[in-house]
Amino acid sequence: GTGAIVEYFGEGATSMSCTGKGTSCNMGAEIGATTSTFGYDDSMRRYLTATGRADVVEAADKVADYLTADAEVYANPEQYFDELIEINLTELEPYINGPFTPDRGTPVSKMKEEAAKNDWPIKVEWGLIGSCTNSSYEDMSRAVSIVNQAVELGITPKAEFGINPGSEQIRYTIERDGIIAAFEKMGTKVFTNACGPCIGQWDREGADKGEKNTIVHSFNRNFSKRADGNPNTHAFVTSPEMVAALAISGRLDFNPITDKLLNDNGEEVMFKPPFGDELPTKGFEVKDPGFQAPAANGSSVQVIVSPDSSRLQLLEPFQPWDGQNITGAKLLIKAFGKCTTDHISMAGPWLRFRGHLDNISNNMLIGAENAFNNKTNSVKNQLTGEYAEVPTVQRAYKAANIPSIVVGDQNYGEGSSREHAAMEPRHLGVKAVLVKSFA
């Protein structure tokens, strides 16, 4: 998918909900896609209407023919697309992706074999649903259908369970419709409507011990140390309903399609297929969406930031290119293997500095593995001959007015669209990033 525009079409694509399409497009970043797209269809009309945007539907309908490919393209797709991949959704079984990367997929029927072969921890410690992906009304309603079955069947969940609603509108609506209460009946922790555990914004007890463990979640990314700072946390990505089933069973190798569970009375029980509503039957509702409209005329608005602030810093324009070739550059780091935005600019505790470019630049490339010594955050300062942290060495080059370059591998920059991953190297004086391909 690197460098490609991926278009989804066909009966299967049409059958998906609008928010389901949104999840597929969101996660297109993990295959390196430049853009992921679905043609305009009824699912989008339904969603836009339900969310109070009938005016957008009216405008889109006027140009609907231009918001999807021509009929002859879909009739003979081989003639028009560079590559054609056919997926039969009726034959597609659930996948569990990971650990440490979302592009390593294992069919649920093969997980027992793969886990044993790779020595992945079988016991599931946490199941997590939500954040920006897989957190729609449909996602929550399908997941809670599994939770309700567990309650009815008398099964006590074997793992801890948490949810992050996708927005205040989703949180308010699922609370009104009893979905949150159903989750809480099973002991689920309801986190705030934010990134949360997806980027380490939670207080996970015991993570500092560095013990080998497994968590499953429906977030879009699961890179090493991302969820809790523990490099031994094996994080797996799967659908919300699969997260619910795995958390209830407490086992990574549980297949809800074929496997039985013992309830609290020692009886063998099985889950029925999940189900849920694409959109709330009573409509969406929210009291305070958190939106503050900007001033009608902002020309007189002044932004005042304390020069002593460690969290906020006004941006200064970058120096423009002087038109000359880069000469005398030092190699800052040759990153080995995967170098995602998490490797380039970690989240978690660093997010407090996201409004202060200089301070957050102290995390630049600290997660990248140096190809010359196979260590993270350890590169050779070519001015002193000593090894030091990546940002420290780069600041030394900048102070000496010496340009530097970064070398990477395939799909450099895969992951969250954090602007810091692009801004930090430039802020600290890196002149070029040389890789086989960019995400």
Where does each model-flagged region fall?
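General structural signal for secondary-structure boundaries
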Residues: 17, 54, 88, 107-110, ...
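A generic hydrophobic-helix recognition signal that picks specific residues
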Residues: 123-125, 232, 330, 408
